[in-house]
Each structure stands twice: as C-alpha cells, then as structure tokens.
Regions:
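Basic, Lys/Arg-enriched alpha-helical interface segments
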Residues: 1-62, 70-76
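Short, surface-exposed charged micro-motifs
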Residues: 67
Length: 77
C-alpha cells in the first residue's frame, strides 16, 4: 500500500509533527487502519459528497479530519 500526500496535506502533517505529537500518533493510527480497511474502522469513516465525491473522511479529533481517497493500491491524502 502506497501513501500519496498532496502538498497541503504533507505540510499539515509536518506541522502536527512539530506542534502536537499526540495528534500525529492518531493520524498514523488512522493511516494504518485505512491501509487495512479503507471504508470502515476507527475514526468514523464516512464518504464525502458533491465536490468531494469519491473521497472519505475520518475523525482525527472533534475539529480535524483526515480526508483521503483509495484508488488502485494508493491512498491519496
């Protein structure tokens, strides 16, 4: 399974590594779970609609979401 970060999501990931290690741990748990079961599991996965149809989101915390798309053998974040 290959993770592909868009520029903005990679910048966010690097930001959280500097600011909040607990949040990075949660993001890593979500990514690991997504690679096993992309459409169910932790973080309350839900499909997005309209402009983001085909994408899914999972809760990092009450305010932040991890948005991703599963295509072929890639997880686009």
């Amino acid at each position: 399974m290959k993770y592909v970060f868009v520029d903005e999501s990679w910048e966010d990931y690097l930001y959280w590594q500097k600011i909040d290690k607990k949040k990075v741990k949660k993001i890593n748990e979500l990514l690991k779970d997504i690679s096993r079961t992309p459409f169910e599991g932790i973080g309350k996965p839900e499909p997005l609609k309209h402009k983001y149809a085909g994408f899914w989101s999972r809760r990092i915390d009450d305010e932040h979401r991890l948005v991703y798309r599963f295509q072929d053998d890639e997880i686009q974040i």
